[in-house]
Regions:
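N-terminal small/polar loop signature for handling phosphorylated ligands or for N-terminal nucleophile
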Residues: 40, 44-109, 158, 188-248
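Phosphate-binding and adjacent anionic-ligand microenvironments
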Residues: 270-430, 435-460
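Active-site nucleophile and cofactor-binding loops and adjacent substrate-binding regions
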Residues: 74-83, 254-257, 279-280, 301-302
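An N-terminal, well-structured beta->alpha segment
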Residues: 1-65, 69-70, 149-171
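Gly/Ser/Thr-enriched, mixed-charge loops and adjacent short helices
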Residues: 110-230
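Glycine-rich phosphate-binding loop
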Residues: 97-103, 107, 227-249, 254, ...
Length: 460
């Protein structure tokens, strides 16, 4: 049996610490396992890309060897943003591709996001890869696969510039956090006619300035300062592999992804009445009524880019988003999450207004908490912990209890959510309400439920 760390096989991707849990040997074996799954589906060619992390080239060589030793042909697109790899996979390889990325994890992490035949690998499909490795159940190749290298950045750029049309040039600031988006985003937005100030767009896998994770306000502070001191109208930020978007107004307000989705939904629905719009369980309760008001059909889904993508395919939804910043456009695009493309669509909408920040600031808003995290005791299963808590929980005054992903409890004046993270051993909590008093009342009800398990510590 091959020696491989089981805990790198996560819910949405494979992710580990390079040289410790994610070794060269592991990358080679995972390459062979993906190739085995591909062969079962009759897939013969896979696109392969990497982000700007220092460990990327080494891991890429190993996974590529795993593919070619298994008879799979490789389209190597080099250093790209994750959405550019998806673009290459869909346009050149029938929807099959592997992206080597650590996303927003610390510099010593890396991992793989995978799609085969147009389907993102997640959940059981990722566990099946582990089973293939552990059983040594690899496909026997009758030939060595070939490798073709191609720069797809020009095609990706031209496709977007070809169909996104701004009403006027805008002045914007972008912050790539030294992630791979920095190599492409500035050129893209200039190509759309904008004046662009670039922050931390030099690709550097050490992330020397701040962490490339726009979902955390501390990572947007440089952008906020630049917007306040300069003459730009709006700020865009990206995570390490540029599949997520952060948005900041001229006056330094962070427009969280559930509010961004209001604007995107309104725009898409103006051309496609009755279209479905998907959002994750963490999103504001003001979103579903907004979608209905603009003629759409709101669909709540569990958190995770792979779940959202599969629900989009099933339902034919035209746009989707989740709180972490993944935005998915099926209308005029390919349905994968793409932070750079979402930024372009946002500029297209906002270019029709003289004061874009005012448009964003006027979007409906409640009082909400940032995400609160509770560490789980070692070895415990977060989903089981939530199930046990939910079994005996009482929520006074609740109007609805939603259990698609953890426990989301709706009240007339707010909601509370607790769910198990799929990527780290924590419980995630979020609260939103019309008033501070209502938030505290809802939090106190959740606190009582959490504290019914003595191993859990209330985070506030």
């Amino acid at each position: 049996m091959a020696n491989i760390a089981r805990d790198i096989f996560k819910a949405y991707d494979i992710r580990g610490i390079v040289g410790k849990t994610l070794t060269d040997e592991a990358a080679y074996l995972i390459g062979k396992a993906i190739a085995t799954k591909a062969s079962e589906k009759g897939i013969t060619r896979i696109a392969l890309g990497r982000d700007g992390r220092l460990s990327g080239p080494g891991l890429m060589a190993q996974i590529q060897r795993g593919f070619t030793d298994s008879g799979i042909d490789v389209l190597n697109v080099g250093m790209v943003a994750t959405p550019m790899l998806y673009f290459a996979a869909i346009n050149e390889c029938g929807g099959s591709g592997v992206m080597i990325t650590g996303s927003h994890n610390p510099p010593d992490y890396n991992g793989f996001k995978m799609m085969l035949g147009g389907d993102t690998l997640a959940g059981e499909a990722i566990q099946e890869l582990l089973a293939i490795v552990e059983k040594d159940g690899f496909v026997a190749a009758d030939k060595q696969g070939s490798v073709t290298e191609k720069d797809i950045s020009g095609e990706y750029h031209n496709n977007i510039v070809g169909h996104i049309k701004l009403k006027r040039p805008m002045k914007i600031v972008i912050d790539a956090g030294n992630g791979v988006g920095g190599a492409f985003a500035g050129k893209l937005y200039k190509g759309l006619g904008n004046e662009v100030t670039e922050l931390f767009c030099e690709v550097d896998g050490n992330f020397p300035n701040h962490h490339p994770d726009p979902s955390k306000p501390k990572n947007l502070q440089d952008l906020i300062v630049e917007l306040k001191n300069g003459n730009a109208e709006i700020g865009l930020a990206f995570d390490g592999d540029a599949d997520r978007l952060g948005v900041v107004t001229k006056d330094g307000n962070i427009i969280y992804p559930d509010r961004q989705l209001m604007l995107f939904a309104q725009d898409v629905l103006s051309r496609n009445p009755k279209a479905k719009v998907i959002f994750d369980v963490k999103s504001t309760r003001l979103l579903a009524p907004w979608i209905k008001e603009h003629g759409g059909d709101p669909v709540m889904e569990k958190t995770g880019h792979s779940f959202i993508k599969s629900t989009m395919k099933k339902t034919g939804a035209l746009v989707a988003g989740e709180m972490s910043g993944h935005v998915f456009f099926k209308e005029r695009w390919f349905g994968f999450d793409d932070g750079m493309y979402a930024g372009a669509r946002l500029l297209e909408i906002l270019s029709a207004f003289d004061n874009p920040s005012e448009v964003l600031n006027k979007l409906p808003q409640s009082i909400s908490t940032p995400e609160l995290n509770i560490d789980l005791p070692e070895g415990s299963n977060g989903h089981k912990v939530i199930e046990e808590l939910a079994a005996n929980a009482k929520f006074e005054g609740a109007t609805e209890i939603i259990t698609i992903d953890g426990l989301r409890v709706e009240f007339p004046d707010g909601f509370g959510l607790m769910r198990a993270s799929n990527t780290t051993p924590i419980l995630v909590l979020r609260f939103e309400a019309d008033t501070q008093e209502a938030i505290e009342r809802i939090q106190n009800q959740f606190k009582a439920v959490i504290e019914s398990n003595p191993a859990l510590k209330w985070p506030l």
